[in-house]
């Protein structure tokens, strides 16, 4: 299968054919993680509703939770106004981060919220 041509024509990819994917938790709106996708990963994600990403380090596609069981069921996919980022609204099972935390954005606060 191939990504719907109407969707593919709206995507802006980097030199490697990749674009940013943000996984956001359904219900809370919490940002869980950021990863890379290509057209194949987005097509697979949309067909299966299982979040599929591109690993730059391994040079291959991976389905979130395929080995760990920490899956992301995708409820919706949105394209941002520039066409270079997709937002996945997901139901997360287990931790989203490879470190074992719920989100990849809970460990290192660079600027604390104002009081």
UniProtKB/Swiss-Prot annotation:
InterPro entries: PRA-CH, PRib_AMP_CycHydrolase_dom, PRib_AMP_CycHydrolase_sf
Pfam families per UniProt: PRA-CH (PF01502)
EC number of the protein: 3.5.4.19
Record pathway: Amino-acid biosynthesis; L-histidine biosynthesis; L-histidine from 5-phospho-alpha-D-ribose 1-diphosphate: step 3/9
Bound cofactor: record note: Binds 1 Mg(2+) ion per subunit. Binds 1 zinc ion per subunit.
Top-rank taxon: Bacteria
Binding site for Zn(2+): 81, 97, 104
Record note on quaternary structure: Homodimer.
Purpose: Catalyzes the hydrolysis of the adenine ring of phosphoribosyl-AMP.
Family, as annotated: Belongs to the PRA-CH family.
Name of the protein this chain belongs to: Phosphoribosyl-AMP cyclohydrolase
Gene of this entry: hisI
């Amino acid at each position: 299968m191939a990504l719907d041509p109407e969707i593919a024509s709206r995507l802006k990819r980097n030199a490697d054919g990749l674009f940013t994917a943000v996984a956001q938790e359904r219900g809370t709106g919490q940002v869980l993680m950021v990863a890379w996708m290509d057209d194949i990963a987005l097509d697979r994600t949309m067909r299966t509703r299982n979040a599929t990403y591109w690993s730059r380090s391994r040079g291959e596609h991976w389905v979130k939770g395929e080995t760990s069981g920490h899956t992301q069921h995708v409820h919706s996919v949105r394209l941002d106004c520039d066409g270079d980022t997709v937002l996945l609204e997901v139901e997360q099972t287990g931790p989203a981060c490879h470190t074992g935390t719920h989100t990849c954005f809970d460990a290192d606060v660079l600027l604390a919220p104002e009081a």
